[in-house]
């Protein structure tokens, strides 16, 4: 019973579309074939000049929201508030998860709660410089869970952490096109005792 505890954890995946219409079908297939089954796939699309074939989402009965404006990278975290699962996984449109990614995240979260991602950075100094050896994840594999300053491309977290993400709102003068990765990790560091991690 304890061995299969992770199987009871529910997960929503948030996909987004903006610049890479060629990856959507492969992403949906990868998520539908996870070893830990995903409960809901939710798709957010900012306005785009590219034409998107949404049939993989329609055929699978997945949730779709298409905006007539570009609300940037932060909008998908607002859309994630609609998730009704234990965990949420937000995936960039340039990322195809391996078939055990969700299983790996659920298992890792049991011992390393917080924010998990596919690429993690450790900053060298106050100017946020990063050397190649301080990048971890798919392009610099780590064999153990690695604590990092920020993660990107894929964010896996308990749904409750959405309230931490939105605890401080960015200024209306700030761009919503970047910065969600630093903001999320900063909010977790500032308001919780959890960390930012890259699973092995």
Model segments located where?
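N-proximal low-complexity "stem/linker" segments adjacent to membrane-targeting elements
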Residues: 1-30
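Active-site-proximal specificity loops/subdomain of glycosyltransferases
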Residues: 50-83
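Short aromatic/hydrophobic "clamp" motif used to bind/position activated sugar donors
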Residues: 88
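Conserved catalytic core of nucleotide-sugar-dependent glycosyltransferases
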Residues: 98-170
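Acidic donor-binding loop at a coil-to-helix junction in glycosyltransferase catalytic cores
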Residues: 177-183
């Amino acid at each position: 019973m304890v061995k299969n505890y992770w199987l009871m954890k529910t997960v929503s995946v948030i996909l987004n579309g903006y610049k890479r219409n060629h990856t959507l079908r492969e992403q949906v297939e990868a998520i539908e074939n996870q070893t830990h089954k995903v409960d809901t796939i939710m798709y957010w699309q900012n306005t785009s000049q590219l034409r998107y074939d949404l049939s993989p989402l329609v055929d699978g009965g997945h949730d779709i929201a298409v905006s007539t404006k570009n609300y940037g990278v932060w909008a998908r975290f607002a859309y994630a508030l609609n998730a009704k699962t234990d965990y949420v996984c937000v995936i960039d449109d340039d990322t195809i998860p391996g078939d055990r990614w969700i299983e790996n995240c659920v298992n890792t979260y049991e011992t390393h709660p917080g924010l998990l991602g596919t690429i993690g950075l450790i900053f060298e100094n106050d100017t946020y410089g990063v050397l190649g050896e301080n990048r971890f994840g798919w392009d610099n594999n780590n064999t153990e869970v690695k604590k990092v300053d920020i993660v990107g491309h894929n964010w896996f977290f308990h749904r409750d952490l959405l309230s931490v993400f939105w605890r401080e709102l960015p200024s209306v003068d700030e761009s919503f096109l970047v910065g969600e990765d630093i903001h999320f990790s900063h909010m977790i560091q500032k308001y919780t005792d959890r960390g930012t991690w890259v699973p092995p």
